Curated annotation (Swiss-Prot):
The keyword Hydrolase does not apply. It is an enzyme of class 2 (transferase). One of its GO terms (molecular function) is N-acyltransferase activity. InterPro entries: Apolipo_AcylTrfase, C-N_Hydrolase, C-N_Hydrolase_sf, LNT_N. Its main location: membrane. This is Apolipoprotein N-acyltransferase. The active site is at E287, K351, C405. PROSITE patterns: CN_HYDROLASE. Catalyzes the phospholipid dependent N-acylation of the N-terminal cysteine of apolipoprotein, the last step in lipoprotein maturation. Its EC number is 2.3.1.269. Pathway: Protein modification; lipoprotein biosynthesis (N-acyl transfer). The gene is lnt.
Length: 531
């Protein structure tokens, strides 16, 4: 292995870039649906050795010194995001006549852009690089900053953050109840990269001991927390039915199918309860499951009232339209409705975090002049974004915190208001992406939000994966991908949070400071020894 490390260190030019790409591609295997945890323990040491091989000439200008580490980081990121996000292209094939031209931009262009974040990560790391275990701290620092920025710059896209690879199952998710994803990103990179010290690096014992301690604490805390009694059912008990209709996206886009789609949802809503289950108090339909503007269809509301039993509530995704005033086109919102047993809309919440190019077109005036449009181009201006996300109060007083579609991948979306709710709600339609890694990755990331908030999650997905997840991230009941049907269960209760959002943010910045100090001191010592 030492010989292999030496060969990787000596690589240069295209060979070094290609190995960086392969290392990033390998790292994808640590994410769902593969969950091959060991892959990260190979890919990140390779990245360390590639950076070890960068020896810029002090006489070079700043740009020439930055290019080699930036190229390594970008190639690693390009491989990682290409291997992890290729399935986004499926959405463009649903209406291939209109959007197939954009496949290269989505499948190759987006990973190329996202790779710039990892280029920054490696540039930061290389500026603090040394020959000891401090360089592992430098790499963790660089990735921590890059992933933090990826979470909010340009609307944010923290999909497949490195930290998720360290949390493949509920046993290893419990740290998210103490620290935020940004902190886990940093510590995960430290642990994943530490094996590089076995063959190359001074102070290997110290670095490996810290990594082993972090990994042991991560797993041991999971064992401890899952050994505690499971959250008791919410009192008074509330039985939830989640509907998973499995409707092909092409059918959803066909206006002629609207009535049959609506009736399909109603038939699943009225299906007999499963063995041992109580009559549902709340029925949940997926995102955009109501295939028309509900407020323009009183007959549809009457049909819902016919199907719902006394006291039942329907929570369903739909497009909501709002009059914008004289002479202006109406505003459309991707929304969730609360409908009571009389067919009355008694609550609604609109999506806050829209998907660029999917639900709206950034720089619309400029890009439409170039002939571009969003997937939601059938609505003038696309969807509008809500400014706030309310906690929805259901008839009877129960409260839910709605997250529509990919809003559930943003850890920061689960703010203090989420703790006011009895349950998190995630409704989505992943039929756009077909039977690919995308829906599995989406579900895994949503699952973590329940752990962070200490609050159970109800998840309804058109084609799957639908589930009820308890406050520890444990699946209470689940309906796998492409299985049509319903799931009925009693909603579990909440758990006390061990730290609040402000404390988790403070821990992140404290960890950032510690890693910087370790890397900077190690770098200083390296410079002194070298001179």
């Amino acid at each position: 292995m030492e010989r292999l490390a030496g060969r990787i260190i000596l690589l240069s030019g295209v060979s070094r870039t290609f190995v960086g790409f392969l290392a990033g591609l390998l790292a994808v295997l640590a994410q769902p649906p593969f969950g091959i945890f060991a892959a990260a323990f190979v890919s990140f040491p390779v990245l360390v050795w590639l950076i070890d091989g960068v020896a810029p000439d002090p006489g070079d200008g700043l740009l020439r010194r930055l290019m080699p580490p930036a190229a390594i980081g970008w190639s690693f990121g390009f491989g990682y995001f290409l291997g992890g996000l290729w399935w986004l292209g499926n959405a463009l094939l649903v209406e291939a006549d209109a959007f197939a031209w954009a496949l290269p931009l989505t499948v190759v262009g987006l990973p190329a852009v996202l790779g710039l974040f990892y280029a920054l990560a490696v540039v930061i790391a290389r500026s603090l690089w040394s020959d000891g275990w401090g360089r592992i701290a430098a790499l963790a620092l660089g990735f921590g900053i890059a992933e933090w920025l990826r979470g909010f710059l340009f609307t944010g896209f923290p999909w497949n953050a490195i930290g998720y690879a360290a949390m493949p199952m509920p046993l290893m998710m419990q740290s998210a109840s103490v620290v935020n994803l940004s902190t886990i990103n940093m510590l995960a990179v430290f642990v994943f990269a530490a094996p590089a010290l076995i063959w190359t690096g001074k102070g290997a014992r110290a670095g490996l001991a810290i990594a082993a301690a972090l990994f042991t604490a991560h797993v041991a805390f999971g064992f401890y927390r899952l050994a505690q009694p499971a959250p008791a059912p919410l009192q008074p008990e509330m039985t939830v039915r989640v509907v998973q209709p499995v409707i092909d996206q092409a059918k959803k886009l066909d206006d002629r199918e609207r009535a049959s789609i609506f009736e399909d949802h109603l038939s699943l809503t009225a299906a007999p309860v499963q063995d041992g289950a109580k009559r549902p108090d709340i029925v949940v339909w997926p995102e955009t499951s109501i295939p028309f503007i509900l407020t323009d269809n009183p007959d549809a509301l009457a049909r819902i009232a016919d199907v719902l039993q006394d006291g039942q509530v329907l929570v369903a995704g739909a497009v909501r339209v709002e009059d914008a005033g004289a002479g202006l086109p109406p505003r459309y919102y991707n929304s969730v409705y609360v409908i009571d047993d009389r067919g009355q809309i008694v609550g609604a919440a609109d999506k806050v975090h829209l998907v660029p190019f999917g639900e709206y077109l950034p720089f619309e005036d400029l890009l439409t002049s170039w002939g571009l449009s969003s997937v939601a181009a059938s609505m003038p201006g696309g969807f509008s974004a809500a400014s706030t996300r309310p906690v929805l109060t259901l008839p009877g007083g129960r409260r839910i915190y709605p997250m529509i579609c990919y809003e559930a991948i943003f850890a920061d979306e689960v703010d203090g208001n989420a703790r006011l709710a009895d349950a998190l709600l995630n409704i989505t339609n992943d039929a756009w992406f077909g039977d690919t890694p995308g829906p599995r990755q989406h579900f895994h990331q949503a699952q973590l939000r329940a752990v962070e908030a200490g609050t159970p999650m109800i998840r309804a997905a058109n084609t799957g994966i639908s589930a009820v997840v308890d406050a520890r991230g444990v699946l209470v009941v689940v309906l796998g991908y492409n299985y049509r049907g319903v799931i009925d269960t009693i909603l579990p209760g909440k758990l006390p949070t061990l730290t609040n959002i402000a404390t988790r943010s403070q821990i992140f910045w404290l960890t950032t400071g510690i890693l910087f100090l370790v890397a900077a001191i190690s770098r200083l010592g390296f410079n002194i020894r070298k001179n």
